[in-house]
Curated annotation (Swiss-Prot):
The modification Phosphothreonine is found at residues 109, 432. Hexamer; each subunit is composed of an acidic and a basic chain derived from a single precursor and linked by a disulfide bond. Residues 35-269, 319-468 form the Cupin type-1 domain. It holds the Pfam family Cupin_1. Residues 114-170 are annotated as: Disordered. Residues 122-154 have a biased composition (Gly residues). InterPro entries: 11S_seedstore_CS, 11S_seedstore_pln, Cupin_1, RmlC-like_jellyroll, RmlC_Cupin_sf, Seed_Storage-Functional. This is a seed storage protein. The lineage of its organism: Eukaryota, Viridiplantae, Streptophyta, Embryophyta, Tracheophyta. It comes from Brassica napus. Residues 1-23 form the signal peptide. This is Cruciferin BnC2. One of its GO terms (biological process) is seed maturation. Keywords: Disulfide bond, Phosphoprotein, Seed storage protein, Signal, Storage protein. One of its GO terms (molecular function) is nutrient reservoir activity.
């Protein structure tokens, strides 16, 4: 009994110590008296594009517990497969392309229709034909049971072993078409790659939730590459000297890789990319023949889940937010707002993240509001807007203009108002809650509408008639007209 009591006392002491350490790791990190529109602080150049990184040590990003990155992939550029230590949500800001994910433990569901003969060159036939068969195979196997999927995986392994002496068909996990407006949710540890098959740059922005319960490391983004090599390294991240960032296969000895993959040592050395200085975005020479579904102009409407087919291997991870006909708030003369949460994309319930897409016309205003359950990171994709943000002390901590490519972090509870100053202002907003709640200060569903007139009149020392106008004059819920440029001065601080 005494031993059990000692063990219990020790466990409680450790928990208290760890809790205290976590709480004191970043003391007062959200006591912000000024916010800034942020630009990328580091650029990692590659053969067919670049990766632009925001400084996650910036106070407002530390408060939100996130990091932010922008991938710019040139035509025929391939972003090599990598995985992250935490949940992330990406948004396709420009262009189109292909995306592939490899979910651990899941079998291949796309199978090629053409047979590859060793020494015959490319194993791929015409893209359209193989795509239709790949889609059929994906749907058929994706709804199969676990044992059937395991059987397919074993069959693929058997085909791979036999491929040294006879023909075989390539098999891999799901490949999707992506386009502007697509929002992509990804689990930690899921390897992901992108390919630009269009004629213009493919621009993808992503937020990583460093404070996620799924991140068991520190509050630093850790990207693990399966292929390629970054000659510039991550000195900006870890404070180390300038040294390349190699892929994870580089750390193993060639002999171990040769035994694991059943290949010769020379090929194993090639997997380590030691002499490869192309970076993490490489240019594909010739056709890019992967199995893909046929491209459709519009995505089919999702059917109601039946509780059987939705597994970690087949879970939908993308949704498009650029279609006004599917908007949650739409006014032809003002603009629209589309919300993506776990009710629309169930995978977000596990990731505890959500997104909002906004597009408003000049002089349209998003009514003052705050998020009661999440931090938010706003990225401008097009145009310009005037934004004011107010903290818990009643100080205006941001009062200025944001433009395309800039980032603004808005902590939980901070109130914000946006007004478009260009012909069109468009943004994507990432939130650290699967079902973030918005509370408005003015409008039909606002906090003012919920207060009695007597409370408003006495609280602000105004007449009942003035209180009535404050409460009822704004009939909109989210978007309204702005009368024109307001007075925007320097951030206002409380009197000393």
């Amino acid at each position: 009994m005494a031993r059990l009591s000692s063990l219990l006392y020790f466990s409680i002491t450790v928990l208290i110590f760890l809790h205290g350490s976590t709480a004191q790791q970043f003391p007062n990190e959200c006591q912000l008296d000024q916010l800034n529109a942020l630009e990328p602080s580091h650029v990692l150049k590659a053969e067919a594009g670049r990766i632009e990184v925001w400084d996650h040590h910036a106070p407002q990003l530390r408060c939100s517990g996130v990091s932010f990155v922008r991938y710019i992939i040139e035509s025929q550029g391939l972003y090599l497969p990598s995985f992250l230590n935490t949940a992330n949500v990406s948004f396709v800001a420009k262009g189109q392309g292909l995306m592939g994910r490899v979910v651990p433990g899941c079998a291949e569901t796309f199978q090629d229709s053409s047979v590859f003969q060793p020494g015959s060159g490319s194993p791929f036939g015409e893209g359209q034909g193989q795509g239709q068969q790949g889609q059929g195979q994906g749907q058929g196997q994706g709804q199969g049971k676990g044992q059937q999927g395991q059987g397919k995986g074993q069959q693929g392994q058997s085909q791979g072993q036999q491929g040294q002496g006879q023909g075989f068909r390539d098999m891999h996990q799901k490949v999707e078409h992506i386009r502007s407006g697509d929002t992509i949710a990804t689990h930690p540890g899921v390897a992901q790659w992108f390919y630009n098959n269009g004629n213009q740059p493919l621009v993808i922005v992503a937020v990583m939730d460093l404070a996620s319960h799924q991140n068991q490391l520190d509050r630093n983004p850790s990207q693990f590459y399966l292929a390629g090599k970054n000659p510039q390294g991550q000195s900006w991240l870890h404070g180390r000297g300038q040294q390349p960032q190699n892929n994870i296969l580089n750390g193993f000895s060639p002999e171990v890789l040769a035994q694991a993959f059943k290949i010769d040592v020379r090929t194993a050395q090639q997997l380590q990319n030691q002499q490869d200085n192309r970076g993490n975005i490489v240019r594909v020479q010739g056709p890019f023949g992967v199995i893909r579904p046929p491209l459709k102009s519009q995505r089919p409407q999702e059917t109601e889940a039946n509780g059987l087919e939705e597994t970690i291997c087949s879970a939908r991870c993308t949704d498009n937010l650029d279609d006004p006909s599917n908007a949650d708030v739409y006014k032809p003369q003002l603009g629209y707002i589309s919300i993506l949460n776990s009710y629309d994309l169930p995978i977000l319930r596990v990731l505890r993240l959500s997104a909002l897409r906004g597009s408003i016309r000049q002089n349209a205003m998003v009514l003052p509001q705050w998020k009661s359950k999440s931090n938010a990171v706003l990225y401008v994709t097009d145009g310009e807007a005037q934004i004011q943000v107010v903290n818990d002390n009643g100080d205006r901590v941001f009062d200025g203009q944001v433009s395309q490519g800039q980032l603004l972090s808005i902590p939980q509870g901070f109130s914000v108002v946006k007004r478009a100053t260009s012909d069109q202002f468009r943004w994507i907003e990432f939130k650290t809650n699967a079902n973030a709640q918005i509370n408005t200060l003015a409008g039909r569903t606002s906090v003012m509408r919920g207060l009695p007139l007597e409370v408003i009149a006495n609280g602000y020392q105004i007449s009942l008639e003035e209180a009535r106008r404050v409460k009822f004059n704004t009939i909109e819920t989210t978007l309204t007209h702005s009368s024109g440029p307001a007075s925007y001065g320097r951030p206002r601080k409380a009197d000393a």
